[in-house]
Amino acid sequence: MDPELEAFIPLFPRTDLADPVAARGRFSELAAAVPVPDTTDLDVEDRTVPADPAVPVRIYRPRRADPVKRGQAALVWLHGGGFVMGDLDTEHPWATLIANGSGVTVISVGYRLAPEHPFPAALDDAYAVLRWTAEHAAALGIDPERIAVGGHSAGGGLAAGVALRARDERGPAIRFQLLNQPGLDDRQETWSARNFTDTPWFNRDKARAAWRHYLGSAPATPYAAPARAEDLSALPPAYIATAELCPNRDEDLIYAQRLLQAGVSVELHQWPGTFHGSQAIVSAEVSQRQNAELGAALRRALAG
């Protein structure tokens, strides 16, 4: 493990998802300890997207972005938290980092959480925000031809599911997928999913519990677990980042390979010495490189 990251391991609480309410409290405490990047160059606004039910979003607009007549590029961003934890506040540091690093308008989505709201609630919320963003692009100052979806962990899996659904339903055009350590496969059969039993923060048992909460009694579909999709053709280009010590690692590597075989352009980065979510340790040099690359990949993909 990267020495700078290893020094922080004792500070990470050992948590499980047996009690979702308690897990959310611990997750909020951990997120509150993450330094919030400077928002001086951002206009931050809370909005509500009309849907059934309404979906809260937080919009981050970089002030320094060069004005473009047809509007700014945008990212619909979905937070991590195993489908069970997280909200607009816990995601504030990440969304701020991405907006500052990319110069792109970031729309952070406060989707409904499992187990109270199992699949497809979170996916429906995410898709509703994508449609709203595209339909109201002019009012939002956004270029409808430069909209990306992305997310971390469970949010990365949601973003991949949104891309599949948009393709199948001929929904809004998605320019790019930004998938950071995404949760893609409920079957948990890969080597990393089976063997990473004691990795920091996120391990085999926690991953399995997250999927149980999210799916409930319903069978998994490709929209819930994108690795189950048989056809990955005609999807948006993707950037996929994996962490070496992460149960999701191998399913992410396999998904990237399958996208390539389906004719989808993919940029893949496997970060050695890192673990799931270790980018939150922003003082570490490797975390700074990871976060900078997320912004740079998005900036390249959405360039006018």
Pin down the residues of each PLM region:
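A glycine/proline-hinged amphipathic helix-loop "lid/cap" segment
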Residues: 1-62, 288, 302-304
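Short amphipathic alpha-helix adjacent to the substrate-entry channel of hydrolases
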Residues: 89-108
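Alpha/beta-hydrolase active-site loop
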Residues: 117-139, 294
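Gly/Ser-rich "nucleophile elbow"/oxyanion-hole loop immediately N-terminal to the catalytic nucleophile
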Residues: 134-149, 169
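Gly/Ala-rich beta-loop-alpha elbow adjacent to hydrolase catalytic centers
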Residues: 151, 155, 159
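Hydrolase active-site cap/lid region
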Residues: 164-218
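Short beta-strand/loop motif that positions the catalytic acidic residue
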Residues: 240-242
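Catalytic active-site module of serine/aspartate enzymes centered on a nucleophile-bearing elbow/loop
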Residues: 283-304
